Structure formats: C-alpha cells, structure tokens
Amino acid sequence: RAKELIEPLSKNIDVSKPMSMLSVAQQQLVEIAKALSRDARILIMDEPTASLSKRECEELYQITEHLRDEGVSIIFITHKFEDMYRLATRVTVFRDSKYIGCWDVDKISNQKLIGAMVGRELTQMYPSKKARIGDTVLRINNISKEGYFKQVSFDVKKGEILGLTGLVGAGRTEVCQSIFGIMTPDSGTIELEGKQVSIKNPIDALQLGIGLLPEDRQTQGLINELPIYQNVSSANMNSFIKAGKLDVNAEEQKAIELCQKIQLKAKDISAPPSSLSGGNQQKVVFAKLLNCDLKVLILDEPTKGIDVGAKYSIYEIMNELTANGYAIIMVSSEMPEVLGMADRIVVMRSGRVVGQFDTQGTTQEMILEASLKHESDRREG
C-alpha cells in the first residue's frame, strides 16, 4: 500500500527505509503521499513543493489537478509564484500574521502581489552586487564518497557567490556536508587559502573558518528549546567564557548586535526561534554563523520556504557578506535565484559535476540541459 501511494510521486524511494535515512525532498514526498492517502474532501498542503525538483513539482501538480477535478477543495500554502499560477483560482496574502487581501489569480499583477506580500514596492528581485572578487579561498579537488558523489571539483573565491545547483538528489547537500565535516570523503583533497586541510568534523571546519547553513533549519540549524540569543551564541560559546564562567550579559549583547546587523524582527531575543517567521528563523541561523570567525559560508537552500520580502533581505545579507570578503557557496534548486545571485554556477547530476558556467550569458535552459544530461554525455568535474 505504501509503495502504491508513493510511486506516483517518486519511483526512487524505498518504502522499507526509515524516514531518517531519506533526504529532505524524499521526506516531503512521503508526507504528501500520507496526506493524499486519507481521501479528504478538504486538503491543506503546506509548502509541498519546497524541496522538490521541477519534475517532481510537475508530478505533484498533476496529482493536485486530478484531486481538484474530483471535487476536493485544496488550500495550497506556498511562496512560489509558479505554484500559484499553475494551480490556484484565488490567492490570499498574509503578512506578519495579518490578512492582507484575496484576489482572483488572473486579475492581479506580479507587482501588486509582491507589494501586498512585502508591504512596499519591490522594484527588483535581486539586489545589486558590490563585492570585488579576489583570490581563490576554497578549492575542492576530485572528492568522492561512495554512494553519494564522485570526483567533484570546484573552487570559490573571496567575495564570490558560487551557485551549486542541479536536480534534487544530485549530491549537492552531501558535497557540502563533506566540506563541513559531517561526512568524510573517501578520496580527494580540500584546500583552504592554498593549503591542504583535513576536516574530520564540524568543529574542525569552524576552526578553519568554514560555516554551514543547513537545508533544514528546524532540525539542523536551530535549537527551539533555547532562546534566540543562545541559538546565536551556540556555535561559539567559548568566546563568552571568562574565568571559567559564562558571561551571559556579553552573550546577550553580542546577540543583540548581530540581530540588529541582519535586521531580525523579534520582540524578545529571550523567546524561542519557533516564535519567529520562517525568514526570521533563517536570519537567526545566519547570526549564529556570523558569531564565528569565518572565511567561507556554505548556504544550503538559504531561502527555502520564505516569502519574497524575506528572500530579498537574505540576498542583501549575502551581498553584504561578500562585500566584506566572505566566499559563499549557495546551494539552490531555484534557477532564477541561482542566475540572480551567483557569479559562477556549478551544475551537478547523480553525484557528478556536469557543467560549470559564468552567470553572465547563462540561461535557465542551459542549466536544465546540463542537469538532464544522459549518463554517457556526462563529463567528470
């Protein structure tokens, strides 16, 4: 029965595996299958496409349209305009927990909709860049991990945003986890500022100046049992210990400083991160990383599940960081985001690098073509 329910969404999920062994995207598909199994007449889908590839989204769209045609009423919560235009007849906007309005999809412009979501006119989706790109900071040389990725190579420079993209399951997250020490490559080398380094765990990575913003902020980036300020300090607690005791006042003041820097909207930093919106929760994870002395930031799907205005705020933070000399690796499944924010783009498929592009002159079609290359056409990176 489980296999029957999951196969329309994905044929690559082993239903006998525990959920903990599935990727975030696969877990999302299982949740969708579970919801669809209940034969409900009203179905609420909360960000169901957040971790899905274009192909998986299309399959979900077809299932959703079939349910609609069968008389099921669907509330589809999303931040993606493509979801709305493909499926919805009406769109309702909430901002800061308040109802803003409801419109027929075919009677509202993008500009008006964005204005309703953001609360102001947003004239461009991606802020202007001001960073000067410098020397190579991090170089990945032919790293491999059996069952995950093979002979992956790329580099990222000071002041640069390197986009790492490809279909869900391409191995992007696993490569980033290997750079950060969560996984250990079987072969290959990692160089930081021209010197080969050994990264056996995340502590090694942080001490070397490499930080990771994980794909799943709820389970991997935040500790909801702790207040916001302790989440901010959690990656660098030693800096607040004086004479063997934790200086709570210094800890709180540093958190306030960092939260102001990233324009966090929080009434009380003693509240848990769960009290914040998705965009502000992501900012808490950013603040935690900024509390460390880093050279390289790995951002795994940094704008997943957040609205247009919050995305723009995250983009501004990224540009400010690169202007201050950080090197950023940005993993993203959203091709417009990759093209709008990255200086160079690395495309992965089935654990291999299948293309590298300068953003200027590159189109979504070129990235998608590389992502869908046949096995025999792949080239090792």
Positions of PLM-derived features:
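Glycine-rich phosphate-binding loops of nucleotide-dependent enzymes
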Residues: 1-381
